[in-house]
Amino acid sequence: MKASELRALDDAQLRAKLSEYKVELFNLRFQKATGKLTNTARPKQVKKDIARILTILRERELAQAELG
């Protein structure tokens, strides 16, 4: 998911996406361990999406602290 798409979401939606991606990453790791992972690039994509979400949430926290 692109960062611009993620920035359009509010905090609650971002946190929901974050939990979805964490569950997906867990399942992908499990598939890799059992040898059933077909798309080997997907775990890297999911990790990057998680990092993007965490970055956006942190940016918003810092902006709020700066304002208030």
From Swiss-Prot:
InterPro entries: Ribosomal_protein_uL29 (IPR050063), Ribosomal_uL29 (IPR001854), Ribosomal_uL29_sf (IPR036049)
GO-annotated cellular components: cytosolic large ribosomal subunit
Gene source species: Chloroflexus aggregans (strain MD-66 / DSM 9485)
Gene name as annotated: rpmC
Ribonucleoprotein keyword on record: yes
Entries under HAMAP family matching the protein: Ribosomal_uL29
Name of the molecule in the record: Large ribosomal subunit protein uL29
GO molecular function, a single term: structural constituent of ribosome
GO biological process assignments: translation
Keyword set, alphabetical order: Ribonucleoprotein, Ribosomal protein
